[in-house]
Amino acid sequence: MTDLPITDAVLREACAAFAFRGTVCDVKPCGNGHINHTFIITTDENGMRRRYILQVLNTDIFRDPDGVMENIVRVTEHIRAGLLAAGGDAERGCLHVVRSSDSTATGIAAYRYVDRDGRFWRAYDFVEHTVCRLTMDSPDTFRMVGWAFGNFQHQLSDFDASCLHESIPDFHNTKKRYAAFLDTLARDPVGRAASAAEEIAFLTARQERGSRIVDDLAAGRLPLRVTHNDTKLSNILL
């Protein structure tokens, strides 16, 4: 991802690249995320205000941004179809990806914009009357968060996970993670192994557990399923 500043001109071009309803009348930074650059876009359509999320995806971390967007489109379309079939609220029950303003764009190009400096942009409808919390304020909030992640798994229980791209290759490959841990432990490059002896002993005593899920998946003993894998509070809208 480029380190060049996101100028007003770049923002205007990015806004024009998506099929936002109405005329853009305000652009503001959104949130305190440390991975992507996010903005709230406000538009005016005959006196009606609408809001959208416009975001620059960090391609230093997500090296296959098209694959990431294909995943999001496939997953959200599956959830949306399920909500509609069950009579649920498909507008608020899942993310809605905003399409490109280029009506000739096809495939994943219809859901993203790459600017003059190589930044990868995407956009969503803003889900009004929701909050994103950084800290847990009550047991009820904790229960709602648990329900949300559990419901996400339920909604995707019949989804073909084999069609998804791996967003960050081997990020959750515990077998490779454990091998990297043992390699670092053997080298002890900054001389801190002795100060963590108790924690290291705990991990090495459970080495056989490190590859259990990966091995069972490879052997067909576990079914391949979609998982969220970043189930923290700030990734939920309440």
Question: PLM ranges: what are they?
Answer:
Residues 231:
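Hydrophobic HxD+1 residue recognition
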Residues 13-14, 37-40, 71-78:
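Residue-level detector of alpha-helical secondary structure
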Residues 2-5, 28-32, 55-56, 62-66, ...:
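ATP-dependent phospho-/nucleotidyl transfer catalytic cores
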Residues 22-44:
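ATP-binding glycine-rich phosphate-binding loop
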Residues 38-40, 123, 226:
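Conserved hydrophobic/aromatic beta-strand scaffold that supports enzyme active sites
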Residues 1-28:
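Juxta-kinase regulatory segment immediately upstream of eukaryotic protein kinase catalytic domains
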Residues 48-71, 77-163:
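ATP-binding pocket architecture of kinase catalytic cores
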